[in-house]
């Protein structure tokens, strides 16, 4: 079981529990990690970002996606406030759907070194074409239950 929560003053490196400025770019954003108290157990963590936003690198128009991030943690967990700030930093970032989705997955994997990670980027149509992007690291640890991401393929009105 977890120990007594620390006060922010005891965790000076974390953004959690303190006022921080919104990062303006993904490169500027800091992803915090915290020790996994269940590191000896294989299990799954899921983050859902149904209102992810970035900018088209050509037109500057907003692009919208439903992101699903699943990972089997190792020694580290992603701290969720820092993930929220990192994802929000894409609001003023111009990149194609594929680049955004894969870059997010790679950055998280680099920071926390999970046993396994996958990201699904379900992008809303631009120019009449929805784009879904999927990326993962290696193989899922044996015995870890991974539910379907459950985001339906875009059908429009037809």
Swiss-Prot record:
Keywords: Cytoplasm, NADP, Oxidoreductase, Queuosine biosynthesis
Active site per the UniProt annotation: 56 (thioimide intermediate), 63 (proton donor)
GO BP annotations listed: queuosine biosynthetic process; tRNA modification
GO molecular function: preQ1 synthase activity
Enzyme class: oxidoreductase
Gene3D superfamilies named in the record: 3.30.1130.10
Pathway note: tRNA modification; tRNA-queuosine biosynthesis
Catalytic activity: 7-aminomethyl-7-carbaguanine + 2 NADP(+) = 7-cyano-7-deazaguanine + 2 NADPH + 3 H(+)
Residues noted as binding substrate in the record, renumbered to the chain: 78-80, 97-98
Pfam families (alphabetical): QueF
Compartment(s) of residence: Cytoplasm
E.C. code: 1.7.1.13
Region of interest (Disordered), ranges: 1-35
InterPro entries reported in the protein's UniProt record: GTP-CH-I_C/QueF, NADPH_dep_7-cyano-7-deazaG_red, QueF, QueF_type1
Record keyword Cytoplasm present: yes
Plastid among keywords: no
Family as reported in the entry's similarity comment: Belongs to the GTP cyclohydrolase I family. QueF type 1 subfamily.
HAMAP family with a match to the protein in the record: QueF_type1
Function, as annotated: Catalyzes the NADPH-dependent reduction of 7-cyano-7-deazaguanine (preQ0) to 7-aminomethyl-7-deazaguanine (preQ1).
Protein name per the record: NADPH-dependent 7-cyano-7-deazaguanine reductase
């Amino acid at each position: 079981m977890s120990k007594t929560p620390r006060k922010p003053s005891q965790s000076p490196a974390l953004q959690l529990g303190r006022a921080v400025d919104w990062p303006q770019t993904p490169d500027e954003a800091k992803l915090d990690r915290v020790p996994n108290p269940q590191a000896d157990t294989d299990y799954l963590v899921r983050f859902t970002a149904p209102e992810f936003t970035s900018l088209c690198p050509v037109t500057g128009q907003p692009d919208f996606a439903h992101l699903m991030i699943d990972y089997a943690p190792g020694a580290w967990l992603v701290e969720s406030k820092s993930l929220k700030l990192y994802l929000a930093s894409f609001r003023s970032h111009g990149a194609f759907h594929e680049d955004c989705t894969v870059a997010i997955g790679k950055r998280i994997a680099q920071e926390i070194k999970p046993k396994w990670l996958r990201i699904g980027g379900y992008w809303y149509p631009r120019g009449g074409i929805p784009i879904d992007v999927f990326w993962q690291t290696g193989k899922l640890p044996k015995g870890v239950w991974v539910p379907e991401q459950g985001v339906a393929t875009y059908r429009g009105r037809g």
